[in-house]
Amino acid sequence: MAANRNLKQVRIENSSPAAPLGMVGGGGGLKGLRGLETENEAAAMALVPGKEGGDEEQEGGFTIDIKSFLKPGEKSYTQRCRLFVGNLPTDITEEDFKRLFERYGEPSEVFINRDRGFGFIRLESRTLAEIAKAELDGTILKSRPLRIRFATHGAALTVKNLSPVVSNELLEQAFSQFGPVERAVVVVDDRGRATGKGFVEFAAKPPARKALERCSDGAFLLTTTPRPVVVEPMEQFDDEDGLPEKLMQKTQQYHKEREQPPRFAQPGTFEFEYASRWKALDEMEKQQREQVDRNIREAKEKLEAEMEAARHEHQLMLMRQDLMRRQEELRRLEELRNQELQKRKQIQLRHEEEHRRREEEMLRQREQEELRRQQEGGFKPNFMDNREQEMRMGDMGPRGAINMGDAFSPAPAGNQGPPPMMGMNMNNRGTLPGPAMGPGPSMGPEGAANMGTPMMPDNGTVHNERFPQGGPSQMGSPLVSRTGSETPQPPMSGVGTVSGGPGGFGRGNPGGNFEGPNKRRRY
């Protein structure tokens, strides 16, 4: 039976006139089975279970699929499927109690208190529990009518101050952190608008107590708005069965109040006066409640406005803090960047200094190497230059640097030294052949001391304009011997070195720069 409990066969005895079937369509399932009016226990057992096979029974019955009694998303064996059975016989056994509900599916919880005559049983779905309650309530069992009600949900909580955007799913998800939730519902009005209230049903009492304590001590928020929910134990009301007449206790007060039937009080009577005072009291209560509700609503609106302003200010503060944090990060990054640039600059300066030092070292080494080379080969170039100078002075002809004599510069007398040439003392030329210049015989026409052959014979008819005509001739031929003492001539500067040439090897100026009162050129 446990393997095939989702498929039950209920056979209704056609011969029983007191067992009609009432089918109420609601939500796609069977709402209730009514019309079972039995007088004894045998009549209460008129509904017998059918066969447990998977095939439908065709003989005087119909098949009920228990799965069809579960609504979409409904959980099975919840607290809402729990029934309270009162006025039980004291000698009833657990097997008899189960057999009483076995036609409505496999129960999961069975509890019997024989001393007080009540018990609890939990069925698979709410619909099956409603069917069992409708069928078995008032049934006579061992001369006792059974009283069946839905058991009070001990793990249900009322949730208030809900936001309009909270749904059933969000409410269940929020309270699932405390324990398994069987059902969570947000209460709405007739137009489907949220009333700000709801309830949550847990599977057991410990999670419900935990949720109640946590929400009472702290502030439990369901949305972004800092609006905490208010959790309270759920008040249990029976708004289905109510209080039937058969359950009323027939006390003295009951009989006294039932003496007068329902009626309207007549104006001017005692009843009308006090009835009016009761109505005034109710009206005052209503007005005060409305005023309290209005004050609470205004306080809530004011609090919401302050909360919005404070949240805006809080967001601005967070943005400022974030901006300051980012500025601090940027400043730190800028400092790191500046430090890195400073390090790179220092490294670059060190590299440049090292490069400059290496260049200076290379230049100094090059200079030292050049100086060393000059010191090693310095004497040989000087010797060669002197040798070349001597060779040039010995090989030059009549128009050379030494044979510069002409009609205007005759050779000196035997006791007369050669004139200095641009500061060069001819007497100091130790390398020239022949005796030193001075008194004595003059050298030949090609000699170093002969200043060249005369360009004009000295016949005494041509005189130099630079000198007085009465003076002795100084332009004579070197071959003519001179007698007597003659006054030495002043040194001539007409013969000199070529500008830029080595000393002693220059050629005479063709134009001749003659010092004296007359500086015209002579040709």
UniProtKB/Swiss-Prot annotation:
Residues 497-514 have a biased composition (Gly residues). Residues 81-153, 155-236 form the RRM domain. It comes from the Eukaryota. Residues 465-523 are annotated as: Disordered. One of its GO terms (cellular component) is nuclear speck. It holds the Pfam family NOPS. SMART domains: RRM (SM00360). Residues 471-487 have a biased composition (Polar residues). InterPro entries: NOPS, Nucleotide-bd_a/b_plait_sf, PSP1_RRM1, PSP1_RRM2, RBD_domain_sf, RRM_dom. GO terms for molecular function: RNA binding. Its main location: nucleus. Belongs to the PSPC family. This is Paraspeckle component 1.
